[in-house]
Amino acid sequence: MPATMSQAFIGNFLGNSPKWYKTAILSFLIINPLLFFYVDPFVAGWVLVLEFIFTLAMALKCYPLQPGGLLAIEAVAIGMTSASQVLHEIEANLEVLLLLVFMVAGIYFMKQLLLFGFTKIITKVRSKVLVSLMFCLASAFLSAFLDALTVIAVIIAVAVGFYSIYHKVASGKDFGADHDHTSEGKNAAGEDQLNEEELGAFRGFLRNLLMHAGVGTALGGVCTMVGEPQNLIIAAQANWQFGEFAVRMSPVTVPVLISGILTCYLVEKFGIFGYGAKLPTAVHRILCEYAAHEDARRTNKDNMKLIVQALVGVWLIAGLALHLASVGLIGLSVIILTTAFNGVTDEHALGKAFEEALPFTALLAVFFAVVGVIIDQHLFAPVIQWALGYEGNTQLVIFYIANGLLSMVSDNVFVGTVYINEVKAALINGQITRDQFDLLAVAINTGTNLPSVATPNGQAAFLFLLTSALAPLIRLSYGRMVWMALPYTIVLSIVGVMAIQTGFLEQATQYFYDSHTIIHHSAKEVLGTVSGH
């Protein structure tokens, strides 16, 4: 029987999302105008924020751009905020959008070099603990300069490559043969061709490495202004450059990095929380043979491409460290240099590089619409006033925890943007000093980045991993990710809180002032970067 028009509408609306989810979003769209016009705009605003957080938390059911975008369009249409306010937010955060558009695409053209490096780590180093530490540290270093999504994308590509090679060889085929590595490895008679114990151990090994790398991106990403998109927003509002940002964060980020690496060592050493899986000898032999096969096939042309990518990588790090141009423009230069010297001139080949980041860039524009509602309806004013009622380190800890809890269930770009805007408003209104604002900016940045490793909702890199084609192959579920992230969540959150609560952040910052490593900023500088006030 053909579907009725109403059934067809529901079927098309939000695609393959569950029916209950579609009903929830439609209910939100009906309820919001009623609350805004007949109850209270403040209540309606908070309901919208909670609905938006719900769409982010349900990202596995439906990408948040569509449901969140519908809520944002309705909010503008009924007057909760204005289109000009949304545009103002986007203008104020243009550098972040350029970072996502150009930097992520630029690193796409450096994937060969990164693949080469991670492949060598796995095939040359036999100690599982050492491999884990190297993956965690390499991800942390790369994420301090590159986008975390890209770093995870590269490691996923390495893992998929290795999984497919093992699956192919274990199924009785050679390296060059076509093979479906997503099959369960049964022959025509339905019998297992693969050694299940060996395959299970290999899956565990890959899960371990991907989780260490994912946490590594958080450890490195919090350290610099380009490590995560929200860092750039916070740096822009505080008027900090690359070096100053790294120095100001270091009293929290350095102890956290050390404790994170120590956690990596301990969970591997004692095989707890799902870690400690060893790479089977037979699998290692296959991977080494494949790496040797690839090395033998590599031509001078291929080697030249790797050299070009390495040189562009040096330019990228130098350009960012010395602030030779805005982040987005450096990303654009990476695209131009890598493609020009490596001969990527086809328009379709260029277009693939932008596929990864543009959906999230569009989602970020929707974030700014919700931020517009928060500003126009003064939603966070009571919360901020309560937090500002405390003084000194307690105030900093409250902001750290408030950011951390929200970042566990929501996107940290959204959370960081909201809080830094509110603290900036407090500075402009004379409620806090500029020095206290700078300390609060550190608490907001670290609180947004560190506890968010708790769930895939908080870290974009984790969500990207969970929704990748690799996750089901290596049996990496939402619950398993949360469990494996738990030791890191506990350690990173507590060490971050302790660095602030004990006064270490404040004392170290004062030392940096006294040694002229950083300078005192004035509140007047803020007026040039005010967002929506």
Swiss-Prot record:
A Pfam match: NhaB
Subcellular location: Cell inner membrane
Disulfide bond residue pairs: none
Membrane topology label: Multi-pass membrane protein
Origin: domain of life: Bacteria
Catalysed reactions, as listed in the record: 2 Na(+)(in) + 3 H(+)(out) = 2 Na(+)(out) + 3 H(+)(in)
Function: Na(+)/H(+) antiporter that extrudes sodium in exchange for external protons.
Protein's recorded name: Na(+)/H(+) antiporter NhaB
Organism listed in the record: Shewanella baltica (strain OS155 / ATCC BAA-1091)
Gene: nhaB
